Amino acid sequence: MLKTVVKKGSYHDSVVLMLLTNKISAIEGVKKISIMMATPANKDIFKQSGLDTEELMAASANDMVVVADIDDDALLDTIMEQTEEFFRQQSAKSGEKKGAESVKSWDKALQKLPDANLAVISIPGAYAALEADRALDEGMNVFMFSDNVTLEDEVKLKQKAHEKGLAVMGPDCGTGIIQSVPIAFTNNVAPGSIGIIGASGTGIQELTTIIDRMGEGVTNAIGIGGRDLNAAVGGITMMDMIDAMEDDDAVKVVIIVSKPPAKEVRDKIAARLSNFSKPIVTLFVGEKPEYHEENFYHAYTLDEAARLAVGLVRGEKIPEAVADVDESTFYKAEDHKTIKAYYSGGTLANEAAMLIKDAMDVKVPPEDIEGYMLQLDGNIVVDLGDDAYTQGKPHPMIDPAKRIECMQEAVDDETTGAVLLDIMLGYGSHEDMAGALLPTIRELKAKAENAGRKVFFIATVCGTRRDYQGYDEAVHKLREVGVIVCENNKLACRTAIRAIGRDFVEPEKEVRVKEVVDAPKGVPSEKLRALLSEKPKIINVGLKSFAEVVEQFGCEVVQYDWMPPAGGNVELIKVLNFLRHYDGLDIDEANREVIAKVVASQPVIIDNVRAKEVIPKLNTGKVILHAGPPVAYENMPDPMQGSCVGAVLFEEWADNEADARKLLESGEIHFIPCHHVKAVGPMGGITSPNMAVFVVKNMTDGNEAYCTMNEGIGKVLRFGAYSEEVVDRLRWMRDILGPTLGKAIRKLGGIAVNPLIAKAIAMGDEFHQRNIAASLAFLKEVAPTITKMEMDEKDRYDVIKFLSDTDQFFLNIMMATGKAVMDAARTIERGTIVTAMCRNGYEFGIRIAGMGDQWFTGPVNTPQGLYFTGYDGEDACPDMGDSAITETVGVGGRTGGRGRALVRPPCRYKICRRWRI
């Protein structure tokens, strides 16, 4: 039975609540429990765990919620008593430490530390991007520990930081060292002359700790987040940091560590590094390079990268470490034993999987299985820090429970010959992970021996002798119970591989002449130079433990005890940030700049082509564009779903309605708002790759916009119809009408839109409902050229007849025009002018000049108006379509007083249900 307790306004950070959940779950009689803040993301986690209740769903992001699956009602009192006691103990511990000064707002934080240059953010991902944006506005670099930040937000933040001469490290950045100050989950590493840039937290930890134990040190180790080398992000932070470290006189050697980047990003980085003026070592985990280049070294393992860097600093070759172990008791290959590897560090797990595959001589990559780095012939490598294991639960660096469970399962498997582990030391990690695992290891070794089996436990300890847990103490404890402890992860992997009778080869690499590419070098900003050369001044937003650590290292720090503002409502928070951004600015002046852009626009129809020729996103699989702000297929109204069916049939992705709907519901088709790809669409707005679109170019700014052609009135795709008649018309428009108009427009050198608008408005058009004059004016422009073109006479007649009969034909041209004009205007990114209005039958959305691509949405209305005979309000569909771009640009309904009122516009209607035959 599920029991729920909601603690209103009781905010606690996620790590504290994970530890609390772990403690309470051990109470006898508790089948399942989760204690989290009621953020939207956490509510999803509750739901996935089968713990969603009405009380939970009604709670706000500022409320702590306890949901427990228990049979005894009295047990709930025990749970809450222990919860309160846990918080009392936490408060007592905090009280014992002097700690950084705490504040409750950005304004107070900035008053306390006005020259802060780094914001460390560790709050729920839904809010992290908003706070990072605020930090950038205040001139601060950002270290974003938070995950679950959208790729779109990451791109915006990093572009903004680059423009301001700042850096965003992250999101999901777990490790950093800035001027010997450890940020987040980091080790206590000696200062030195090696700089590191990494898209990998535990990869940085392994590198820095090996370097430290070899007697060298690190200037700065900059985490950039796992997606920085994604094609969409483009390596923004990586490239800026490469420039900054080349400029830093304290850096003698640079190491770059990452998973393999996107090809275009990799090429850009390789070109830049080819003319880097200092020795550099690269490691793309999972790749096996075959050679080095002069002063440009390519490592296979983290150990090799660290040894290369230390050797370059010292000017000597550093030999590999060896394992002090008696191999005579190891298994032979014919014993067919397996390795079970359970890691808390993702990069270390990745390296282990790579080395085991190498040893097994795997030619074909094994199947990817969620939660596993490797699952091959009984050998498994698991990253226990993966989201599959940590949603709503403590990370394995701070809680041994999941690893203990996995080790028990491993020993129960009679094929297991070796169990491979990492022990992560450092700030943020368990205070004695080795000690916490000892009882289980001792018990499992005895269990295997009693069964007449050998199971070798092999570990690597990632840490330094400066770490508060004590490196030597951890190694000693493990060896006391018979664990083979190796100097680094590569050696631990090799030992485990040899323990089951196999090995891998790491041949010596030749050094080739470096091929230098003429690539541009950036000039690091003064703010980046300061970040890498001085102790940071930090505003810590979130986990208090991060502030406590940096203060120990002599940093000025203010602890911002963050709680979700505006009741956790993300949309309201965005509005508040928008208003803050404009506080003290001349909004009227900004608005005048935007309007000046609108007035200066010179839209010209330059072509008519297939949509996929001008919209790259339509070439990335099965993609359909729709009207309005983003909407899932299941939330689309019936007419829009019907339009999607028509598009699928038109594209021949299916040959009947049933298969089309099955495909649409499968998730295989990717839906994108037209507005996201410089397009607009009437009603459903459905646009697929091979549909014909007008191309309108704003000659003033050079930007383009696109819109499908008007099909006329009646059974048409935009109203949700998808019969054979509808699909055949679309194909005729693709094959005959579009190419004919495209050729005519190109022959004319384009058609200026402003003169057509001027003529038509004087004749009574308003360009949304009334377009007769403009449609005929367009026909007047193209008809003479069409009559002279070489083409089939019937096709010529059909084109002219269609244009003559379609009174609304100009609407779609006007929509593309409005989009081209407003897209140019919103490049100002200041002011409060609305730059887009649109509907998707589910939500009404607007964009504002000063907020860029951000959507502000609300429930869509159902229009009230006149209906055709036989229909009434019950048939009406909630409003949809991008055609309100006409009103946005200043025509449509806004010109009603200027044009002659010829007709009251009919309501949008839902009669498509009767058009499916």
Q: Model-derived features: where do they sit?
A:
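Anaerobic metallocofactor- and corrinoid-dependent redox/one-carbon enzyme cores
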Residues: 5, 48, 199, 321-405, ...
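Catalytic-core regions of core metabolic enzymes
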Residues: 1-521
